[in-house]
């Protein structure tokens, strides 16, 4: 004799098993997205942290390479200028290439720049290393935000965007403190040395974890707008970053750069509206 309620119980268990099986792809996709966002966020944290770490090291670098303060300041100014020029192109890059490809390029550039910076025999080599780092940093920040907007479910999107904002705001704030400790104990090259294994691990994890399914497009690339944006943001950033030389030495270059930047920005805006 069949025990009471055995039939309905078996049917209920079968329905629950089917429901769990149906939900499995969704759970797998959520875990995949969490891994992608996690790797991108941690990479962005390290790369944005790098933006401010050398400020404390400038006096030591000046002594090591026997350069003036105005030359050493280019380690910061060059970084900002590169980001100002590269960031406007990321809209095109994100449409043209997959998330995985851009991650490999961005973190790969930063990894190479960090290695070269740690071994830099001259100031020029160190400056080039900083520019390479900046190019990677300029790509990873928009990539993190775009991936969040396109991949995360709407009900979680606000939370993830908030966490991304924490990454962007906290990293540059703690950079000088951490670099001060490292430089005092190990020297300025250790700033690059400590970042190198961390970013290398993130690079390897990202190559394995990031798998993208979205289709890429071949959007038209407006060369004129790119040139205008480079002059606009590059000129404005250089003008503001060099304001000290204007005040202390009466240099005219910052004023010219700033005016050219503003003019290029106005032309850029008019062109974008008319397209």
Model-derived features with residue positions:
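Cytosolic juxtamembrane N-terminal segment immediately preceding the first transmembrane helix
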Residues: 1-49, 63
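Extracytoplasmic
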Residues: 35-90, 175
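Hydrophobic transmembrane alpha-helices of multi-pass secondary transporters
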Residues: 32-48, 79, 109, 113, ...
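Hydrophobic transmembrane-helix bundles of small-molecule transporters
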Residues: 184-275
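Helix-loop-helix hairpins in multi-pass membrane proteins, especially solute transporters
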Residues: 87-224
């Amino acid at each position: 004799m069949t025990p009471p309620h055995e039939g309905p119980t078996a049917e209920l268990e079968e329905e629950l098993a089917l429901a769990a099986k149906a939900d499995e792809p969704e759970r797998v996709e959520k875990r995949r997205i969490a891994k992608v966002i996690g790797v991108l966020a941690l990479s962005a944290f390290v790369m944005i942290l790098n933006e401010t770490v050398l400020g404390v090291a400038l006096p030591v670098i000046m002594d090591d390479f026997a350069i003036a303060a105005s030359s050493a300041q280019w380690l910061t100014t060059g970084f900002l200028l590169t980001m100002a020029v590269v960031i406007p192109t990321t809209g095109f890059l994100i449409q043209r290439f997959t998330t995985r490809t851009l991650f490999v390029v961005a973190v790969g550039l930063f990894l190479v720049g960090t290695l070269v910076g740690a071994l830099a025999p001259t100031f020029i080599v160190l400056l080039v290393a900083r520019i390479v780092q900046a190019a990677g940093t300029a790509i990873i920040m928009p990539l993190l935000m775009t991936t969040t907007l396109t991949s995360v479910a709407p009900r979680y999107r606000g939370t993830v965007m908030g966490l991304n904002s924490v990454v962007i705001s906290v990293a540059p704030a703690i950079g000088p403190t951490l670099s001060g400790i490292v430089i005092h104990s190990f020297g300025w090259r250790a700033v690059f040395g400590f970042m190198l294994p961390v970013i290398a691990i993130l690079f390897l994890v990202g190559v394995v974890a990031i798998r993208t399914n979205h289709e890429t497009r071949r959007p038209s690339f407006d060369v004129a707008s790119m040139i205008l944006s480079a002059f606009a943001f590059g000129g404005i950033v250089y003008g503001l970053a060099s304001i000290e030389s204007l005040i202390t030495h009466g240099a005219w270059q910052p004023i010219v750069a700033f005016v050219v930047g503003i003019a290029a920005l106005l032309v850029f805006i008019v062109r974008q509206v008319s397209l």
